């Protein structure tokens, strides 16, 4: 399913992904100038690192419409079989970037054992022709198509993963019967309201980044949810999270959050990505003592008060804030034995003396292995 990027024909493309087997990860386009955590992740949304995005406005503008940016090409001819080489016993069908307009034209009913279907980056407008596979189908991936409505999936009761990201969907509907779902990806659509999730007690990951959502609501039945990705929306408050006892990761970059105090409702949180918001203080985060990774970059935070009790903290991304006191940094962070990575670039404490900045941080926090983009196998102080 690998495909080399097409030559530029003068027409705008969607996304060219060289390896569609890499699950795209939610993008927060501004994940702060090269910052990466210990696993090499830079805080961006679910887009493969090999993706070539030639219409970036699709991510930055929630009002963006790609009606005029469809790949040129003719509909599949009646006698053309794109799946001719596939065995009838195949458990995985992949047909990506092939200008498919109709799922029915693929005649999927001949494959009796299919567990996964991936039809990414096509021109599909309607979900159809999949019902005959309902008994075996577990994973349906229709990422980057032209789908406006969540219809045609009434028989798909055994799905555990559904990806309808980068489509034109406005409402989450007609999937309440998918009670086995564990992963639901609806990134970069036109969704303004979280709804229709009442029956998803087994859901562990929900991705709704790059939509038009203003409020976190209707999540209380998601008792198994571990990861919630809602970056690049219009959310102003962290309310509505109290019914998520297993939430481990919250990605809410590029919203309008000012107050962290509602986080006390999710004390089990281990990773919080809240860059590019309107934070001026970290007060309210004190009860999240299980936090291991905290990204507060690109806010207006002037001090680290609130982090004193976060003994398990491993990574702190705090670039481009208003932090200026080395003494306070040492006081708050020096006792955190697991802390290995910090980012403070773009703060007054770095801008005032960039030549001495890293050495000062190393002296204050000798347990570190990484300061900004610089990694150390062993810190040898001058």
Model regions and ranges:
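Short, flexible active-site loops
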Residues: 276
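Conserved ABC ATPase nucleotide-binding domain signature region
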Residues: 150, 172, 194, 216, ...
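Conserved strand-to-helix beginnings and helix N-cap segments that scaffold or border functional pockets
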Residues: 130, 153, 175, 197, ...
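Extracellular beta-strand/loop-rich repeat segments of large surface/secreted proteins
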Residues: 287, 297-303, 308-322, 327, ...
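Metal-dependent phosphoesterase signature
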Residues: 244, 266, 288
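The feature captures the LRR N-terminal capping module
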Residues: 1-148, 157-170, 179-192, 200-214, ...
């Amino acid at each position: 399913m690998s495909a080399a990027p097409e030559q530029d024909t003068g027409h705008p493309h969607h996304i060219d992904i060289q390896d569609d087997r890499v699950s795209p990860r939610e993008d927060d386009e501004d994940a702060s100038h090269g910052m990466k955590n210990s696993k090499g992740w830079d805080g961006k949304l679910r887009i493969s690192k090999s993706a070539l995005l030639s219409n970036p406005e699709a991510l930055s503008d929630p009002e963006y419409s790609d009606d005029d940016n469809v790949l040129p090409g003719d509909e599949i001819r009646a006698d053309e079989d794109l799946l001719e080489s596939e065995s009838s016993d195949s458990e995985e069908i992949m047909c990506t970037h092939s200008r498919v307009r109709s799922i029915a034209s693929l005649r999927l009913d001949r494959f009796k054992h299919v567990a996964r279907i991936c039809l990414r980056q096509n021109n599909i407008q309607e979900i159809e022709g999949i019902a005959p596979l309902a008994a075996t189908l577990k994973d349906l991936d229709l990422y980057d198509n032209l789908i406006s409505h969540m219809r045609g999936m009434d028989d798909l009761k055994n799905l555990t993963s559904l990806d309808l990201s980068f489509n034109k969907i406005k409402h989450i509907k007609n999937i309440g019967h998918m009670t086995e779902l564990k992963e639901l990806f609806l990134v970069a659509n036109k969704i303004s309201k979280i709804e229709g999730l009442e029956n998803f007690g087994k859901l562990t990951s929900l991705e709704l980044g790059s939509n038009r959502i203003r409020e976190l609501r209707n999540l209380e039945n998601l008792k198994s949810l571990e990861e919630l990705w809602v970056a690049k929306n219009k959310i102003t408050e962290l309310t509505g999270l109290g019914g998520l006892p297993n939430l481990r990761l919250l990605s809410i970059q590029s919203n309008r959050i000012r107050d962290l105090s509602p986080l006390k409702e999710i004390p089990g949180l281990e990773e919080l990505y809240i860059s590019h918001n309107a934070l001026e203080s970290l007060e309210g985060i004190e009860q999240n003592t299980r936090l291991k990774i905290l990204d507060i970059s690109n806010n207006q935070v002037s001090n680290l008060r609130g982090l004193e009790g976060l003994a398990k903290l491993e990574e702190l991304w705090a670039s481009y804030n208003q932090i200026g006191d080395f003494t306070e940094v040492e006081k708050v962070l020096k006792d955190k034995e697991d802390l290995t990575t910090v980012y403070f670039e773009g703060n007054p404490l770095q801008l005032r003396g960039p030549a001495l900045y890293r050495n000062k941080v190393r002296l204050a926090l000798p347990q570190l292995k990484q300061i900004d983009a610089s990694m150390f196998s062993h810190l040898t102080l001058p």
